[in-house]
Design a protein with these regions (language model features):
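Conserved Rossmann-like nucleotide-binding pocket used by diverse enzymes
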Residues: 27, 92, 201
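N-terminal pre-triad scaffold of radical SAM enzymes
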Residues: 2-44, 48
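Solvent-exposed, non-transmembrane amphipathic alpha-helical segments
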Residues: 25-29, 46, 51, 55-58, ...
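Generic structural signal for well-ordered alpha-helical scaffold segments
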Residues: 13, 75-79, 192
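General N-terminal targeting signals
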Residues: 21-25, 35, 41-43, 54-55, ...
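Conserved Radical SAM active-site core
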Residues: 3, 37-135
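Conserved AdoMet/S-adenosylmethionine-binding subsite of the radical SAM
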Residues: 85-88, 97-246
Length: 246
């Protein structure tokens, strides 16, 4: 199966539970959503852009590949980069669960290396998660607030989290000035009803797409409220942007 891959690079995870960990990022093209604050929206719906492989010392293969491509086209580069230590491989996007077969093939190829697979997802494609969950080690699941994106995905999020809770999963909620308390309470209720021990990460929005930054007071108030319901709540911004990392 072919897929659109926009880039592969080694960098620091800047969000969520594993912030600061070194990962090899495989960014897939395509998404089933259109969030206004998306920072990869230019790559979300086009296979016309080439796949760019980060330049690294000693690698002699092509660093720009035509999309869509086969997994065999990028495995030599992935194997070369993994000669250096990495915490895990981040499969990100876009929405990587649009390509469950690619994820399964990747897991099969990487099994001899025993490196964890880290899935970054918008938490809506339940059937696709069911296809790959046995091969995934860590799940970073977004829970989208309707007040920010203009549409509710509560049923999808609930079903997704029930399945994902079998793994090392945490939920990330982007918080803007426009995010409503009603949406937040709904999200808390869903998480609590599945497992109050699931980590919730509140991520202050990096202003984009007409949404505005949440105040420090709002972030503290929302964390306080979440801690009354859940056992583990953290506020973590997009730290990679502070460090000028990809």
């Amino acid at each position: 199966m072919q897929a659109g891959v926009s880039e592969i690079f080694s960098s620091i995870q800047g969000e969520g539970k594993y912030v600061g960990c070194r990962q090899l990022f495989i960014r897939l093209i395509g998404c089933n959503m259109d969030c206004p604050y998306c920072d990869t929206d230019k790559l979300a719906h086009s296979n016309l852009v080439p796949c760019v492989l980060e330049k690294c010392e000693g690698y002699e293969g092509d660093l720009e590949l035509k999309n869509p491509l086969d997994l065999n086209d990028i495995m030599p580069y992935i194997n070369y980069r993994l000669q250096q230590p990495h915490h895990s491989i981040s499969i990100t996007g876009g929405e990587p669960l649009l390509y469950p077969q690619i994820i399964l093939e990747l897991a099969k190829n990487l099994k001899p290396l025993s490196i964890p697979l880290f899935l970054e997802t918008n938490g809506t494609l339940v059937k696709q998660l069911a296809q790959v969950i046995d091969e995934i080690d860590i799940i970073s699941m977004d829970m989208k607030l309707p007040s920010d994106i203009g549409k509710a995905y509560w049923q999808e999020h609930e079903e997704f989290l029930k399945l994902a809770s079998k793994k090392d999963v945490y939920v990330k909620i982007v918080v803007s000035n426009e995010s409503t308390v009603e949406d937040f309470e709904k999200a808390l209720s869903i998480i609590k009803n599945i497992d109050e021990n699931i980590l919730l990460v509140l991520q202050p929005i990096t202003p984009l797409g007409g949404l505005h930054e949440a105040s420090p007071e709002k972030m503290l108030k929302w964390q306080t409220r979440a801690m009354q319901v859940l056992k583990n709540v953290r506020v973590i911004p997009q730290t990679h942007k502070m460090m000028n990392q990809l």
